[in-house]
Amino acid sequence: MKRMILFTSCLLLIDIVVGGKEGYPADSKGCKVTCFLTAAGYCNTECKLQKASSGYCAWPACYCYGLPDSASVWDSATNKCGKK
């Protein structure tokens, strides 16, 4: 029984560590992907196009879970949206 609990705990830890990053996906201009006035499921589809595991509308922008490390994610510290 102890081994089963240890095994399950290890699997959960691996999922947390390997789960990927999360955040607001950035478009080619560095802006968040908007979900203002979009259909239900839009953000989940957009996130999956960027190889994320899932996503939802955190109004007014999409938020993704399980993004690959190479995915571009919006960051307030390096925000270039609307700047020249």
UniProtKB/Swiss-Prot annotation:
Residues 82-84 form a propeptide. Residues 21-82 form the LCN-type CS-alpha/beta domain. SUPFAM superfamilies: Scorpion toxin-like. Disulfide bonds join 31-81, 35-57, 43-62, 47-64. GO terms for biological process: defense response. It is found in: Secreted. The keyword tRNA processing does not apply. InterPro entries: LCN-type_CS_alpha_beta_dom, Scorpion_toxin-like, Scorpion_toxin-like_sf, Scorpion_toxinL, Scorpion_toxinL/defensin. CDD domains: neurotoxins_LC_scorpion. The modification Cysteine amide is found at residue 81. Keywords: Amidation, Disulfide bond, Secreted, Signal. Residues 1-19 form the signal peptide. Pfam families: Toxin_3. One of its GO terms (molecular function) is toxin activity. Has the structural arrangement of an alpha-helix connected to antiparallel beta-sheets by disulfide bonds (CS-alpha/beta). Belongs to the long (4 C-C) scorpion toxin superfamily. Sodium channel inhibitor family. Alpha subfamily. This protein is not toxic. It induces an immune response similar to that induced by whole venom. Thus, polyclonal antibodies raised against this protein can neutralize the effects of the venom. This is Toxin-like TcoNTxP1. It comes from Tityus costatus. The lineage of its organism: Eukaryota, Metazoa, Ecdysozoa, Arthropoda, Chelicerata.
